[in-house]
Curated annotation (Swiss-Prot):
Pfam families assigned: Gp5_trimer_C, Phage_base_V, Phage_GPD
Entry protein name: Type VI secretion system spike protein VgrG1
Stored InterPro entries: Gp5/Vgr_OB, Gp5_Vgr_C, T6SS_RhsGE_Vgr_subset, T6SS_Vgr_RhsGE, T6SS_VgrG/RHS, Vgr_OB-fold_dom_sf
Family, similarity comment: Belongs to the VgrG protein family.
């Protein structure tokens, strides 16, 4: 029952009758971006109330004035204690908090991907059975590609995420329930009562009033600049600035600069810079107020009137408030006979100001830092062995991620550190699915992992047994979707030093200039099939024809060749042989020497032709013919040989895969055989591609990187030969000088 002041406080707990408890006093703390905290001092005629009927049960405090409800607060009992017992009453103490408080009881590690902030917040609320919430968002909030809750309570994560996105939240109350409202602009605030400023000569019957208003201004950062970096746009600054307002009473040179800004896109950068500025200046213009209006709560505005300082008679919003009430008559045994009283004290800012929580404050804890590197497994979709994107990034499964499925959805694309990384040069070794990697975090940020190392474990063993092969340095790969491997191995054991190379299929080597081998002992080459070697033409300097390639061989000792089948040697011009002593040739059946013009045999002392018992000998003493019969012009036929049946060597075509192995050079002359410099040409290559240009000063053109096959070249003669007679023009011909598939 209300006393003479008209005030009364009542409480209802769980399913207990409303008469179970009477309120002796209460203290209620509320603030933006914080769960409220209600402490109740109660008395009851029951000395043995069942704790199970109270703890974690709904509780509602009602504040009445002259029988009219002024304020209600609904929540759940988080703490219940029994105090002193007397003859009639037993004292109890309750702590009541909103359902959101339950999020502080669960700490977790998890990953959210490609979700908007409000979607992430909804997931967390619903997992705790909270369905009465709303989003009053004015601004667009981009999806977060990768957002990690790392060793945080769900409540800390909600508060931090909301603050990073410039959101704030407050509670609204209805009969038996309360709603959480998330907002990002002051326009979402609820308009509250009009309160007059009471100089002390007016009573409560004239309406709720403000009895104290302390106004304050403070110097705060004047502007904010944030900067970040994205590997997708490395040359772009990603810098954003925001300038504060209401700087008339302070300097405008107090800039707050920070890196990284925790964003990768311009829209987010602009918003985050504004959020940071609003948070840093959230108390630059503020007030501390005392009143008797129980209806006030965070997320609400009120209008102040009748203050002697007319500039303060405007709209204000409440950012935090403490309500206190005492009902002494509830404590009969302690002689409680004073009046029921209520008052509050609260902090305010301008109603037009969008209040945002400052990171690092009780309303918005700092983002947790990862203390050091972590272990993770490379993952990907079923059936894949290597899974990466165009940047060589991979997907990871962290041991602490209980929600991941060890597939391509387990994480965002994570960058991989390589030993060397330049513009289309450097090293590249993609971690494969199932590999264990070491993951570091840029600035300790769990949202920015990067693979910095790889490790073996009990399942993924090293290429060779250890420590038996501890002197080996090995680079071994594994055939993708097949069996086999490539390997480069260094053996450093004294006396057994070795460089070993194993290729599962082909070896292609391209040296743009010279290659030199110095082997100080033996060289053994074992080829199971065929060997094809070519010493080819070398492109000349600009405008010069190519030079011929030569093969030089010097053997200080013997050279022994054993060819078990045929041996074919083709020399397009001349073959010169010079022997220091003897030339000894033995054929099992036939030696056939044939010349297109002449054969000359010249000896310093003797030439002998011998067949069976017959011979012809030419020496310094004359010509000797010996045989059973000497025939001169006696008929018969000359003997014949088998003729040349050698084979040309195989071409290197297709054996070397190089982007610079084929070129084509051509030139064009007039009827006087003078070069036609500057003549436009059009070359249609064998693959249908077209090259166009003009001939150089020598009437020549060189095309590189051309496909093998036949090409056609036509010339635009219209302007070039305008001063020549028709007869000369018709006599002109185009010459395809050389089409070479050699580079």
């Amino acid at each position: 029952m209300a006393d003479s002041t008209g005030l009364q406080f009542t409480v209802k707990v769980g399913a207990l009758p409303e008469s179970t408890f009477v309120v002796a006093e209460f203290a209620l703390d509320e603030a933006l971006n914080r769960p409220f905290n209600l402490r109740l001092e109660l008395a009851s005629a029951q000395p043995d109330i069942d704790f199970g009927a109270v703890l974690d049960q709904p509780c509602e405090l009602l504040v009445w004035y002259n029988g009219e409800l002024q304020r209600r607060v609904c929540g759940v009992v988080s703490d219940f204690a029994q105090g002193d017992s007397g003859f009639r009453r037993t004292r109890y103490q309750l702590m009541v908090q909103p359902a959101l408080w339950r999020l502080s009881l669960r700490q977790n590690c998890r990953i959210f991907q490609a979700q908007k902030p409000d979607e992430i917040l909804s997931i967390l609320l619903q997992e705790h059975g909270i369905t009465d919430y709303a989003f009053a968002l004015k601004n667009e909030h981009a999806k977060r590609e990768y957002c990690v809750q790392y060793r945080e309570t769900d409540l800390d994560f909600v508060n931090r995420l909301a603050a990073e996105e410039g959101m704030f939240y407050f509670h609204e109350f209805e009969a038996g329930k309360h709603r959480i409202v998330f907002a990002d602009d002051a326009a979402a605030l609820t308009a509250g009562p009009e309160l007059f400023f009471n100089l002390g000569n007016r009573s409560l019957e004239q309406g709720p009033y403000v009895r104290q208003f302390h106004y304050r201004e403070a110097v705060r950062p004047s502007d904010v600049e944030l900067k970040d970096y994205s590997c997708k746009t490395p040359a772009y600054g990603l810098s954003h600035k925001k300038q504060g307002s209401e700087l008339e009473h302070q300097r405008d040179t107090y800039q707050h600069f920070d890196y990284p800004g925790r964003y990768k896109q311009d829209p987010s950068g602009k918003a985050f810079a504004q959020h940071r500025l609003d948070a840093l200046r959230n108390d630059a213009v503020a007030g501390q107020v005392k009143s008797n209006c129980a209806a006030l709560l965070p997320g609400q505005t009120f209008s102040l009137t009748e203050h002697p300082n007319g500039s303060l008679n405007t709209d204000w919003q409440i950012v935090r408030i403490r309500h206190t009430g005492e009902q002494p008559q509830a404590l009969e045994e302690e002689g409680g006979s004073g009046p029921t009283v209520y008052h509050n004290e609260f902090g305010v800012v301008k109603a037009s100001t969008t209040w945002r929580a400052r990171i690092g404050s009780p309303e918005a804890p700092h983002k947790p830092m990862v203390d050091g590197p972590q272990i993770a497994m490379v993952v990907g979709p079923d059936g894949e062995e290597i899974y990466c994107d165009e940047h060589g990034r991979v997907k990871l499964q962290f041991p602490w991620d209980r929600y991941g499925s060890s597939n391509d959805q387990s994480s965002c694309w994570v960058r991989v550190s390589q030993g060397w990384a330049g513009g289309q040069y450097g090293m590249m070794a993609i971690p494969r699915i199932g590999h264990e990697v070491i993951v570091s975090f840029l600035e300790g940020d769990p949202d920015q992992p990067i693979v910095t190392g790889r490790t073996y474990h009990a399942t993924n063993r090293p290429p060779y047994e250890l420590p038996a092969n501890k002197t080996r340095t090995v680079l071994r790969t594994e055939t993708h979707q097949g069996e086999g491997f490539n390997e480069l191995r260094f053996e450093d054991q004294a006396g057994q030093e070795e460089i070993y190379i194993h290729g599962q299929k082909d070896l292609n080597v391209l040296i743009e200039n010279d290659a030199a081998w110095h082997i100080k002992h033996d060289q053994h080459t074992d080829i199971d099939n065929e060997r094809v070697t070519r010493v080819r033409k070398v492109p000349g300097e600009e405008g010069a024809p190519p030079s011929l390639g030569n093969d030089h061989l010097t053997v200080e000792g013997e050279k022994r060749d054993h060819i078990k089948a045929d041996y074919s040697l083709t020399v397009d011009t001349s073959m010169h042989q010079k022997l220091g002593q003897s030339w000894l040739t033995q054929a099992g059946q036939e030696v056939h020497v044939k010349a297109g013009a002449k054969v000359v045999l010249e000896a310093g002392s003797e030439i002998t032709v011998k067949v069976g018992g017959c011979f012809i000998k030419v020496d310094g003493g004359g010509v000797t013919l010996v045989g059973p019969t000497i025939k001169m012009n006696s008929g018969g036929n000359a003997g014949s040989g088998s003729g040349w049946a050698g084979k040309v060597p195989k071409s290197m075509e297709g054996m070397l895969d190089s982007p610079h192995t084929r070129w084509m050079k051509f030139y064009h002359l007039d009827s006087e055989l003078m070069p036609l410099a500057g003549t436009p040409y059009k070359a249609v290559l064998s693959d249908g591609s077209v090259r166009e240009g003009t001939l150089d000063g020598e009437g020549m053109a060189l095309l590189e990187d051309v496909p093998a096959g036949t090409a056609s070249v036509t010339y635009d003669l219209q302007d070039t030969f305008a001063d020549l007679p028709r007869e000369s023009i018709s006599a002109l011909t185009g010459h395809l000088d050389s089409l070479s598939d050699e580079g």
